[in-house]
């Protein structure tokens, strides 16, 4: 493991010190290579499963002369990557001097193609959404970003989509993290491809966002597919339509790397940020192995943190050290858990640590305030 002697001395001397592995950060940002398993969903087209009451719902209170950002707000469009309202992202891009609009259709997680499939099948709407975003923020140009590694998929992607240049991103997973500095230097703003499609529909068809694009996949269903579904659909309803197996042992909603396990399929509904629903037959055991200190989790962290020490500090409840080790910078990609030979739940423990650190800091602040009042 890395030598901490100088850093610990700095800490004991009362200095604030960052424990990120800057010497290894470039290596870490290369990411890890994952099997994609995007077929047959990616090449199978998009199936539409919508409730009658949520199909083509008109935008409330739409006024003649509303600008693009206002329409995005009234349409309730949510960016599928960030979970934030699209109008806020557009407004921020407009105020920051954005020069380039980027349509994110990366889909770098295994099984998931719920951004790429709409980008390929609904290219006209995507391009229209890109042009609207450019107009809204005053950008000069635009491009789309698509993951280079598509595994065994027969889908071919040209140099442009409807005239918009395509940048094939070749970094490992998580690919988006490797692009942050590049986007910052270019003054580029990134928007989810699906959000841009919904923007085109809102402006041209005057309809609100009531649907989301989702990939249903895994060996626990008869076939995988990309869907456009209304936001009132449950995970169980969608999985059963595609042959949910009785042997399914685990269902994950979100993504294969960043998703969360769910148990109540019929009460878990899709949201505007749901990217996939995966059903797996594999039996996931809690082996309770002991960490062997190999450091593989540190090697792959895309933001240069030390999952090894963060995991140890969470287990020990050492909250002050969690802050010193920049736990708040964790992006939740799950690569640390993926490479762990002991099958430890490193990523989920770090997520728990982030939440407990907030509670710890709030309690500490409240205690200090009470002491000041008594003084």
What are these regions (language model features)?
Residues 1, 26, 232, 237-241, ...:
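Short alpha-helical segments in extracytoplasmic peptidoglycan/chitin-binding modules
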Residues 2-27, 32:
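N-terminal, Lys/Arg-enriched amphipathic/low-complexity engagement segments
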Residues 24-41, 158-162:
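Residues forming the flavin
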Residues 32-93, 112:
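Acidic low-complexity segments
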Residues 50, 65, 75-82, 90-95, ...:
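Hydrophobic alpha-helical positions that pack around
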Residues 139-145, 211, 246-254, 321-324, ...:
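Flexible, glycine/charged-enriched surface loops at secondary-structure junctions
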Residues 277-288, 298, 302-375:
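Ferredoxin-type iron-sulfur electron-transfer modules in oxidoreductases and energy-metabolism complexes
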